[in-house]
């Protein structure tokens, strides 16, 4: 549970620390707005995103399932600045155990809505799917632009960070991994 009152106090102190008047017209409601925003963007802290995968069904399908271009928004834990982009999630069911496609998007969203590192986010999604669905394999690729690289520091707008997590058959079979990467629209940079 987010303590909005503490956030409001902290935001007011930050405004004062940078030389602003937190009581001026344009800023007087800013602490409340920021507290509500943090409650929304960090909603994943109060949930276990893998619970979305507890509902599944058996289908006669043991080929690749890929949901690509899932929009995601998260906050870099180093600077509390946003990073945003898209996730691609592929898995190969074992014994026809599949989940709803929206559940994969909900897992991405749940893990993204917390202070994060893109590398950890990618692995958390893959590990949750492996644990809950026990598929033959999982591949997760995330492409994101980080505001901590765009608006401060090196100031390189438009640069993208790409991370991947490969589990099961995607880690052991070059052909399977290459098929997934081709469907996503990337050439596989990974080799056995």
Swiss-Prot record:
Q: Which GO terms describe its cellular component?
A: cytoplasm
Locate the residues binding Zn(2+).
Answer: 76, 79, 148
Family from the record = Belongs to the GTP cyclohydrolase I family.
Q: How does it assemble?
A: Toroid-shaped homodecamer, composed of two pentamers of five dimers.
Question: What pathway is this protein said to act in by its record?
Answer: Cofactor biosynthesis; 7,8-dihydroneopterin triphosphate biosynthesis; 7,8-dihydroneopterin triphosphate from GTP: step 1/1
Annotated EC? 3.5.4.16
Q: Is Metal-binding found in the keyword set?
A: yes
- SUPFAM superfamilies to which the protein is assigned, alphabetical: Tetrahydrobiopterin biosynthesis enzymes-like (SSF55620)
> What gene name does this entry carry?
folE
Which Pfam families does its entry note? GTP_cyclohydroI
Classification via HAMAP family: FolE
Keyword set for this entry? GTP-binding, Hydrolase, Metal-binding, Nucleotide-binding, One-carbon metabolism, Zinc
Asked whether the keyword Ribosomal protein is assigned, the reply is no
Query: Which segments cross the bilayer?
Result: none
Q: Which reaction does it catalyse?
A: GTP + H2O = 7,8-dihydroneopterin 3'-triphosphate + formate + H(+)
What are the BP-aspect GO terms?
one-carbon metabolic process; tetrahydrobiopterin biosynthetic process; tetrahydrofolate biosynthetic process
A Gene Ontology molecular function term for this protein is: GTP binding
Uppermost EC category: hydrolase
Q: What is this protein called?
A: GTP cyclohydrolase 1
